[in-house]
UniProtKB/Swiss-Prot annotation:
Subunit structure: Homodimer.
Gene: rpiA
Entry's EC annotation: 5.3.1.6
Active-site residue list: 104 (proton acceptor)
Amino-acid positions noted as binding substrate in the UniProt annotation, renumbered to this chain: 26-29, 82-85, 95-98, 122
Catalyzed reactions per annotation: aldehydo-D-ribose 5-phosphate = D-ribulose 5-phosphate
Protein name per the record: Ribose-5-phosphate isomerase A
Similarity comment text for this entry: Belongs to the ribose 5-phosphate isomerase family.
Pathway: Carbohydrate degradation; pentose phosphate pathway; D-ribose 5-phosphate from D-ribulose 5-phosphate (non-oxidative stage): step 1/1
């Protein structure tokens, strides 16, 4: 599995060229993309500027000598590469297994080309087998948990040891065990309108390419263009 993740990450790095501003994703597959960019910076003199999606990725990129800028200092990003926890046939996805969904979505929004790197196990018919992360403010989080519980969403707080995990943005994550999300777009809108929800892990209609690594090789899937 790790070998497939590395293949996907290294393949995505081939889309990066000199002068680009690139979004650096978070997670076990995006890790290999960042590593390959670091190698190219060091060995090939690749000239890029990175925008990171988590403190973990910032630390990795700094260690590799990749120049970084804050999202607040750029207007657009040429290319962002990130992982995904599930991708359906309509190119909707669940992200946030690494608890970085808010920053990942913020970086994805001004991106001209958005690529996900996954192994074949992440491609699914319907989203929802992977728990859907919902980032919530700490104030009122227990009340919101009960709302989700009453709705039948089977919520659980993301934990770190014996305490609730706190994201880079100082929020909590409530994971929803939905089993199957029949209409990701509608459910995303529902969560968007829920007071106390900062962001959710449904990335609907955002990705341009999905690089899928399997035992048979690498496949690049192109999402249909809007309109």
């Amino acid at each position: 599995m790790e070998a497939l993740k590395k293949i996907a990450g290294v393949t995505a790095a081939q889309y990066v060229t000199d002068g680009m501003t690139i979004g650096l994703g978070t997670g076990s597959t995006a890790y290999y993309f960042v590593e390959e960019i670091g190698r190219r910076v060091k060995q090939e003199g690749l000239q890029v500027v990175g925008v990171t999606t988590s403190s973990v990725t910032s630390k990795q990129a700094e260690g590799l000598g990749i120049p970084l800028k804050s999202i607040d200092d750029i207007d657009s990003i040429d290319l962002t590469v990130d992982g995904a926890d599930e991708v359906d046939k309509d190119f909707n996805g669940i992200k946030g297994g690494g608890a970085a969904l808010l920053m990942e979505k913020i970086v994805a929004t001004p991106t001209k080309e958005y690529i996900w790197v996954v192994d074949a196990s992440k491609m699914v018919e319907h989203l929802g087998a992977f728990k859907l992360p919902v980032e919530v403010v700490q104030y009122g989080a227990d009340r919101l948990f009960r709302v989700f519980e009453k709705a039948g969403y089977k919520p659980s707080f993301r934990m770190k040891g014996d305490s609730r995990l706190v994201t880079d943005m100082q929020n909590y994550i409530i994971d929803l065990d939905l089993g199957c999300i029949k209409d990701p777009v509608a459910f995303g809108h529902l969560l968007d309108g829920t007071v106390g929800v900062v962001e959710h892990g449904l990335f609907n209609g955002m990705v341009d390419k999905v690089i899928v690594a399997s035992k048979d090789g690498v496949t690049v899937l192109e999402a249909p263009k809007a309109g």
